[in-house]
């Protein structure tokens, strides 16, 4: 039990990825034919959508942004589908199942970044950018260096996320469906490539929307059945859970998963600013027609996600009552069959029988596909748009850029499958924490200051951004998660599991210092360009909308 909790708590936003949701010990389950049939129905339906989307992808705008014609409501659902992962569902429910109230604190932690995105980023990002957040960061700064840094930040985050997601997918499918791990990884990789290769952002968007609807429906039904069991009384829910849980009343006490205030603060900052620096999330704001729709996207997405995380809290307590106290779901040693992360899946069986169990298992797989499709598209756009079309071959035609993007999708897919197989038995939970730390320490400071600080220069952004990225990586390696748990050293050089507090500080200080001391003519010119950028970011004047976007 302690190992499962440690692995879950040792990642910055463990629920941002399927990998860490199943980082504890898992046991392969018997082949679940109902789940497989339901999943095949989902795959056939989404491949049909991909075929439909492929007929409508005629240009670079269509491929990267679905023509800019996604509505705020649709994009809000898609963002929720991109952000709510299998770990959000299984991992958070498992945390509530084992630790009670602390699970709610973690689930709410994933929402704290969205007000930042709503009030500080969404509108200006849409008004200044076209396809990637590097468009915004390089708006008035030197194109080459800034795009290289932004693309590197994006690709590192995408790669770490993708590896962890593929390993998580293989283990999760082995656990839920009884399929072989290698078959599961190849299946996810091939489907991911097909969605992105042929359907681009339009297919990816609708896969994410469908997945979000299915996940919200499944979680709502489970929460409804749990509340029905206790007469729709939260008092009864908590009382019954405390009565059967081994920890008793202690499950209602907070503070059991974070050791000290610095770790808590660092974790919170990583969650908050990491979310605002995830390339596959930021890319979604270019799929809407204008800044107003971008704001609506965040509003709807936050509502859907907030509702979902409240449901996971109810599901977790429901699992304590209906699963934890039921010997049918325990093995001979008294442990939950399949591990604690199966709590929500067992609850699906308890409240809806085998048919609903199959549905929830299929939804968990669909969840993984939606997330990896978004990641792959973000990685491909960083290579084709930021590096190829704007650094290495300026003036490349749309056709050339799209060809590079699709080649990148194939390469990313093959690499993801190979690394997913190679990392099968490795502890990859730290990759999620590192991805969020880099997003918070490199991507976020550059995006924020490029839009809001008139004195930012290319020198400051480059040196500060690289310092933030390197600091996050080094501190993560020297911390307890990698240095002790993975490399086997006796004591960590850096005592905290979460580096975000320190790496973010280094990034902001570095950007400020090297920009403030930049007295070059180029730096002065970049400062003068801020006023024109500010006007466009506020008014949207000059922004192309809709299909022309």
From Swiss-Prot:
CDD domains: SLC5sbd_u4. Keywords: Cell inner membrane, Cell membrane, Ion transport, Membrane, Sodium, Sodium transport, Symport, Transmembrane, Transmembrane helix, Transport. GO terms for cellular component: plasma membrane. The chain crosses the membrane at residues 33-53, 77-97, 103-123, 148-168, 183-203, 206-226, 262-282, 303-323, 355-375, 404-424, 428-448, 464-484, 493-513. It is found in: Cell inner membrane. InterPro entries: Cation/Ac_symporter_ActP, Na/Glc_symporter_sf, Na/solute_symporter, Na/solute_symporter_CS, Sodium:Solute_Symporter. Transports acetate. This is Cation/acetate symporter ActP. The lineage of its organism: Bacteria, Pseudomonadati, Pseudomonadota, Gammaproteobacteria, Enterobacterales.
């Amino acid at each position: 039990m302690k190992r499962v909790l440690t692995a879950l708590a040792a990642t910055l936003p463990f629920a941002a990825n399927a990998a860490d949701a199943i980082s504890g010990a898992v046991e392969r389950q018997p082949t679940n034919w109902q789940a497989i049939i339901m999943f095949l129905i989902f795959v056939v339906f989404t491949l049909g959508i991909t075929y439909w989307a492929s007929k409508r992808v005629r240009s670079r705008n269509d491929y990267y942004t679905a023509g800019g014609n996604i509505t705020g409501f649709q994009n809000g659902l898609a963002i929720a589908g991109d952000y709510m992962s299998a770990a959000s569902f299984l991992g958070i429910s498992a945390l509530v199942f084992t630790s009670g109230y602390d699970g709610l604190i973690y689930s709410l932690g994933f929402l704290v970044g969205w007000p930042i995105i709503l009030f500080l980023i969404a509108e200006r990002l849409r008004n200044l950018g076209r396809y990637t957040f590097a468009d915004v960061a390089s708006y008035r700064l030197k194109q080459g260096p800034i795009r290289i840094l932004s693309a590197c930040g994006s690709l590192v985050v995408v790669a770490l996320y993708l590896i962890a997601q593929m390993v998580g997918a293989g283990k999760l499918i082995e656990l839920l469906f009884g399929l072989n791990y290698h078959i599961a990884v190849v299946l996810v990789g091939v489907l991911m490539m097909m969605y992105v290769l042929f359907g681009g952002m339009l297919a990816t968007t609708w896969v994410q929307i469908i997945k979000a609807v299915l996940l919200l429906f499944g979680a709502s039904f489970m929460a409804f059945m749990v509340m029905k069991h206790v007469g729709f009384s939260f008092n009864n829910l908590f009382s019954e859970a405390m009565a059967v849980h081994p920890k008793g009343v202690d499950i209602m006490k907070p503070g059991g998963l974070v050791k000290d205030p610095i770790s808590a603060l660092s974790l919170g900052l990583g969650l908050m600013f990491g979310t605002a620096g995830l390339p596959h999330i930021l890319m979604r704001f270019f799929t809407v027609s204008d800044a107003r729709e971008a704001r609506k996207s965040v509003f709807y997405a936050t509502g859907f996600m907030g509702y979902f995380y409240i449901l996971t809290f109810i599901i977790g307590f429901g699992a304590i009552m209906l699963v934890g106290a039921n010997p049918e779901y325990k093995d001979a040693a008294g442990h939950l069959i399949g591990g604690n992360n199966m709590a929500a899946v067992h609850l699906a069986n308890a409240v809806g029988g085998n048919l609903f169990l199959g549905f929830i298992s299929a939804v968990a797989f669909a969840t993984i596909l939606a997330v990896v499709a978004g990641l792959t598209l973000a990685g491909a756009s960083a290579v084709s748009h930021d590096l190829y079309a704007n650094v290495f071959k300026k003036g490349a035609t749309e056709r050339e850029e799209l060809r590079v993007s699709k080649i990148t999708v194939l390469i990313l897919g093959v690499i993801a499958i190979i690394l997913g197989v190679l990392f099968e038995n490795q502890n990859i939970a730290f990759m999620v924490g590192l991805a969020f730390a880099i997003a918070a320490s490199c991507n976020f400071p550059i995006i924020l200051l490029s839009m809001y600080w008139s004195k930012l220069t290319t020198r400051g952004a480059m040196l500060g951004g690289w310092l933030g990225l390197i600091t996050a990586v080094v501190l993560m390696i020297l911390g307890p998660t990698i240095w002790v748990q993975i490399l086997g050293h006796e004591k960590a050089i850096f005592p905290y599991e979460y580096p975000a507090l320190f790496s973010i500080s280094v990034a902001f200080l570095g950007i400020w210092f090297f920009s403030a001391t930049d007295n070059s003519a180029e730096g002065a010119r970049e400062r003068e360009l801020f006023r024109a950028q500010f006007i466009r970011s506020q008014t949207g004047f000059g922004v192309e909308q809709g299909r022309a976007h």
